[in-house]
Amino acid sequence: LYPADKDVRSICFTDRPIETNGWETVIVERRFSDPRRESRMYKILAHQWFQNTASSLWIDGNCELLVSSSELFAFLEKVDIVMPRHPTNKTLTDEAELIVKLNKAPTEQVQKQMAHYPNHNLPIGATSWLLRNHTNTISSLNEAWWSELTVHTLRDQLSLPYCLDRFKISPYLIDVDLYNNKLVRVHPHRGVG
């Protein structure tokens, strides 16, 4: 893990003891055999793990904060959910096509999921880092988002726009280069070819 921001409570959920570079470690018992589903549960259902917290920032394990998290939390003053704009995909259709092209999920599952979504032109964000206020509406959004992942593919960027639209939530999609910006650096995943 990259160094934790010392100005906020930084928590790492893990199923085994690891060196965390300043993070508070919460050892959890695995609930799912698929580690992707496991990590997405903590990512999506943040309101369940941080019930007495006004807001939270999720960052994937391959992300490094380049600014204090207070700079990022400032984005939440006017909206309840913030993430970077997707670097290549503009719409849900673009995301679905890329998922199929890169074999990130079975084509049939992606097609079935897209058939379930009435609007394919929804804007898409990248969810490698995600800021949320813990409002009742955002908690309901999180639950619906998790439900989509239990019914359809595990591709969270595919299901989130549908849920945002369903709850009439307009996220703030920050216009930054996901891989080269002054806020959060996204590094290549280790051990992934």
Each predicted region: which residue ranges?
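Glycosyltransferase catalytic domains, chiefly GT-A lineage
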Residues: 1-193
